Amino acid sequence: MGREGPLVHNAASGETHETKVSYSRLLTSRTFIGCVAATFGAYWALSLGLTWFTPFIVKGLGFSQKDAGWISVLPWVFGAFIVILTGWLSQRLMANGMTTRGARGVLGAAPLIAGGLILLGIPHVDSAGMKIALLVIGSGLCGSIYVVCPPMLGEFTPVSQRGAVIAIYGALYTLSGIIAPFVMGTVIQHAGGAMLDGYMTGFIINGCVMIVAGLLGLLLLWPNTERARLLSEPAQAKFA
């Protein structure tokens, strides 16, 4: 439990001459920054789902607590489907010869942009059911980035440093879990009696954050060239 999987051979074969890469280089690499930025936007949507989705259904749309109970399950069902689909599709694309830039970077970032655009449409539909559907689909698409970022980081990070790099990555992107609920609450409070308008403004902000995060992901996620850049440095690192 907790050890590197079967794709990592150097620990099992007794190879210990792994050259480390400085954390300043790893943490300022464009793919690391892209992973943090993209997942920051995805976690923004996730944290709002945990904190404000049910209140939106009950107080914003007028559903009963009983109905809210089963409606609140929908984002997690759809999100689980996206996670499984992304993992399967990424493996298929790589097996067919696509670079990890496309099979991981683009595949993880593009759904963030699509999801953000969907969220921007919520204020423009009148049906409560359509609002919920757009929110479920738009927020659920962000699940794609969680699947691809850890393996992308693993592509260019030396084996002995992967745990630390992935832990730092997680600590940074989850900061949005503190910011997003506060922003939504502030917007709703300032809306006064027009609570639904406050929710709509909050979801517009959510959509914009996801779009920016997705665009940054498309711009910065180049794990295959990141590895080549590190290997071209004088202090070469050894990769699994």
Whereabouts are the PLM-identified features?
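Juxtamembrane intracellular "pre-TM" segments in multi-pass secondary transporters
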Residues: 4-36, 60-63, 235-240
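Extracytoplasmic gate region of multi-pass secondary transporters
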Residues: 29-86, 146, 150, 177-185
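Interfacial helix-cap and linker-helix signal at transmembrane-aqueous boundaries
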Residues: 57-58, 89-90, 94, 185-194
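A membrane-interface helix-boundary motif in multi-pass transporters
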Residues: 64, 103-106, 186-210
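Cytoplasmic loop-to-transmembrane helix junctions
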Residues: 67, 103, 161-168, 198
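A late C-terminal transmembrane helix in Major Facilitator Superfamily
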Residues: 83, 156-192
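C-terminal transmembrane helical hairpin of 12-TM major facilitator-type secondary transporters
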Residues: 101-149
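Multi-pass alpha-helical transporter architecture, strongest
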Residues: 118-123, 205-236, 240
